[in-house]
Amino acid sequence: MSKNPIHIIGGGLAGSEAAWQAAQAGVPVVLHEMRPVRGTDAHKTDGLAELVCSNSFRSDDAENNAVGLLHAEMRLAGSLIMSAGDANQVPAGGALAVDRDGFSDAVTKKLEAHPLISIQREEVSGLPPADWDQAIIATGPLTAPSLARSIAEATGADALAFFDAIAPIIHFDTIDMDTCWFQSRYDKVGPGGTGKDYINCPMDKDQYLAFVQALIDGQKTEFKQWEGTPYFDGCLPIEIMAERGVETLRYGPMKPMGLTNAHNPMVKAYAVVQLRQDNALGTLYNMVGFQTKLKHAEQVRVFRTIPGLENADFARLGGLHRNTYINSPTLLDQSLQLKSRPGLRFAGQITGCEGYVESAAIGLLAGRFAAAERLGQAPSLPPLTTAFGALLNHITGGHIVSDDEPGKRSFQPMNVNFGLFPPVEAVKIEGKRLRGKDKTVAKRHAITSRALGDCRQWLGLPAPTETAEAAE
């Protein structure tokens, strides 16, 4: 058993979680983060686990939502990212959203204080040297060009890429609350919430149609060197959605369902723009689903046509950057190791998962796998029935391009979802098969119940009833 540390390149969500898991297992870690020595197009600070896009970890409903289930599994596994998120949550309906600065600060302080973690602020411009016999590359979607080239050369394949976008953030005191109102969709109460966690900006039909046209006509930032790079459907720029059809937005991020105008409850809005709290103080709100590649001056002009935002002061305007990821199913084994170089693992968005939580989850697994090998043990893979296992299986075993479709790129970034889980047997109540919505709900409950039970068993944790009895 070697006493060499595990070297982790990248101090984002995946790298931070990987470092924490390995150190908690008793293995020394060197975490390499290039900021502030070298910055990126999206990062604004040198804090670890900085959230560069949304401040939302999405749904926290572990019974009905796949990402909520992943939250629960990560908490069971002692996730640093989830504990920091829980400690810095801000109201967001049924979602878990966080104060981005407080969250990053909490992660940074925890890692700096851990006796087995050393943080080195430096750029790693190539693949780890041979004497780094256990290493994890968790450089994320904004991997530095020199390292990206080294990865491409080592794998014999060009990195895949897609566009990702950032939504604007607005100062709360510049929002007209005589026009807007506080309400969560369907008054849903989430973690740390009240059922009135979003600011809603209503539009009538004429305002909506004019807004859609303004999005389409607005001047966009050009990225000619990235032509042919696809968008990730879960993070489409608002103007791209507008171009797909005049009704697309009001059935997407601007849907009015479940919302009643507190100032005029008898009149139903044709469309609604929602703003979500971005920091614990409640002084900043981000525009939900409003990722954009509009030029900055155009963003100010167009977004100030939204009722209630006529005098909006923007703390941050939207932007666009390119994400890179590798063809993981062909390059990585089940424990996230590069097949051509044992001991070198990849974690986070660079593996082809999408989302903060998913990236951290893959970092969690990579850290555990590397620590196990350092301790002379075989990595313990999570069951396919868990959210951990379903996501890992998608990354390392899903969507390999077939020989008869050589030109088709089938592996693309994906959020965790119930379609990645093994099916469950048809759920029956009193011997009768369920149908419609009841069937869907029962199926999800069966998947999540099975997942949590199998996750506890994988982690060596007692069942919930046993925990309760032990506490007594």
UniProtKB/Swiss-Prot annotation:
GO terms for cellular component: cytosol. It is an enzyme of class 2 (transferase). One of its GO terms (molecular function) is tRNA (uracil(54)-C5)-methyltransferase activity, 5,10-methylenetetrahydrofolate-dependent. FAD binds at G10, G11, G12, L13, A14, G15. It comes from the Bacteria. Pfam families: GIDA. InterPro entries: FAD/NAD-bd_sf (IPR036188), MnmG-rel (IPR002218), MnmG-rel_CS (IPR020595), MnmG_N (IPR040131), TrmFO (IPR004417). Disulfide bonds: none annotated. Keywords: Cytoplasm, FAD, Flavoprotein, Methyltransferase, NAD, NADP, Transferase, tRNA processing. Catalyzes the folate-dependent formation of 5-methyl-uridine at position 54 (M-5-U54) in all tRNAs. Belongs to the MnmG family. TrmFO subfamily. This is Methylenetetrahydrofolate--tRNA-(uracil-5-)-methyltransferase TrmFO. It comes from Mesorhizobium japonicum (strain LMG 29417 / CECT 9101 / MAFF 303099). The gene is trmFO.
